[in-house]
Amino acid sequence: MAAKLRAHQVDVDPDFAPQSRPRSCTWPLPQPDLAGDEDGALGAGVAEGSEDCGPERRATAPAMAPAPPLGAEVGPLRKAKSSRRNAWGNLSYADLITKAIESAPDKRLTLSQIYDWMVRYVPYFKDKGDSNSSAGWKNSIRHNLSLHTRFIRVQNEGTGKSSWWMLNPEGGKTGKTPRRRAVSMDNGAKFLRIKGKASKKKQLHLPERSPDDSPPGAPVPGPLSASAKWAASPASHASDDYEAWADFRGSRRPLLGEAAELEDDEALEALAPSSPLMYPSPASALSPALGARCPGELPRLAELGGPLGLHGGGVAGLPDALLDGAQDAYGPRARAGTPSYFGSCKASAYGGGGGFGPPALGSLRRLPMQTIQENKQASFVQAAAPFRPGALPALLPPPPPAPRPGPLLGAPGELALAGAAAAYPGKGAAPYAPPAPSRSALAHPISLMTLPGEAGAAGLAPPAHAAAFGGPPGGLLLDALPGPYAAAAAGPLGAGPDRFPADLDLDMFSGSLECDVESIILNDFMDSDEMDFNFDSALPPPPPGLAGAPPPNQSWVPG
């Protein structure tokens, strides 16, 4: 049996002796420090293998016995092979340059001399001296000379010669120098250490709070950020400013020129938003006409929106103090009942409403909640934009209108438009025509100021700006209009159960109707360049009973 095994056994090459390894088959193989330990490990491995193997493996075990002495020689070779760092050895470029400079008699070399030393004394660069294959390693040498502080450059005395490279006598650092950054509160090493200690102390002293205890708008407590730890840091204000202004929707503020005329505290109040979700309230606005600030008692739109019930609800929850504040908002002039007329068509462009009210609030800028116009015909902004003395009563749903017995003739307190129209003579006043069959006031509104929506479409009556005209009793509205307009306007104003247009409904006004017509004509009609009363769009077709040619379409523009 043993003779058969010897006959099939192959002679083992001493250079490729079999290596024993543990049964776990780990890689790389463990390298024993001592030959004795390796012999013991080999013996243990062979003995362990012989216990598990059959008689054939036991017979081959003596043949593998001479391997341990060879394994002792292989161990150190592998260890040296794995420690190689670069293709030419374990030295770096900086080490090679240092050796080249130290080998020179003057301890200095030019760049070309360093190249020559590399090709001559380093075996790896012997065949890489030509220009095609030397671009890479020569570039690396130049970089190392520039980056390391151990090398210094000395200007050559001769003209047209390259500089000398020498070793730094002070002994510079090896390796690349880190990039320098400007020291600040955020990246300085000293401040970073202080910041870390301060944050730990602050976290230890902070009481634990649950998210349920915090108010609704407060942030949830969590780990302190860098901006929260250092409030004085310049970078810490960016997130705070963003959170403070993230919900601010617009930039509708008073002009800086107007705010500069106020006191310092008033200017700050005028420039600050009333809330993050709305524009500044009318209380902080400036009156363009009188140059005075609006009273602070005016209600804000957010407070008016709820009790007024914009979606068709009632006004049962409207506080009495709100009505009293609106009546007293304009001081003794409003209580005396002497509202003056100011007629700027810009008011109709800013949401309808109008132009008949105190001049302090006529040209207010466009207020928020303007999008209600898209859903409701008679918008809340139209009624609340100028904030006249009769604005809040005008917002209330009117009582059911009683049938009127006759046309609008001889009623006390009629519009004094006749005096205003007398300054601009037109066609002669036509005699009053008999009333046509009653038409709906909503179908043919005659409005001095164009409203975007029909009056009363949402249950809110538009403001009675026409009622601000005071005049002598007994004046006729139809006499105030030019001839064709007076004849055509007689139809919709006839008697019937329908309501009058909001511009002509005198029941909506509860104040006095006194006014100086001459001051109106001199101050407002003459000075205004944008006055344009256009009745073409509001005229109904002439009644069939009227004789004569139809009136021509024309616009009445004062000169």
Curated annotation (Swiss-Prot):
InterPro entries: FH_FOXO6, Fork_head_dom, FOXO-TAD, FOXO_KIX-bd, TF_fork_head_CS_2, WH-like_DNA-bd_sf, WH_DNA-bd_sf
UniProt-listed CDD domains: FH_FOXO6
Pfam family, one: FOXO_KIX_bdg
Biological process annotations from GO: memory; positive regulation of dendritic spine development; regulation of transcription by RNA polymerase II
UniProt entry keywords in alphabetical sequence: Activator, Cytoplasm, DNA-binding, Nucleus, Phosphoprotein, Transcription, Transcription regulation
Major place of residence: cytoplasm
Modified residues (Phosphoserine): S184
Tissue: Expressed in brain in areas of the nucleus accumbens, cingulate cortex, parts of the amygdala and in the hippocampus.
Biased composition, class Pro residues, residue ranges: 213-222, 539-553
Record's protein name: Forkhead box protein O6
Originating organism: Mus musculus (Mouse)
Gene label: Foxo6
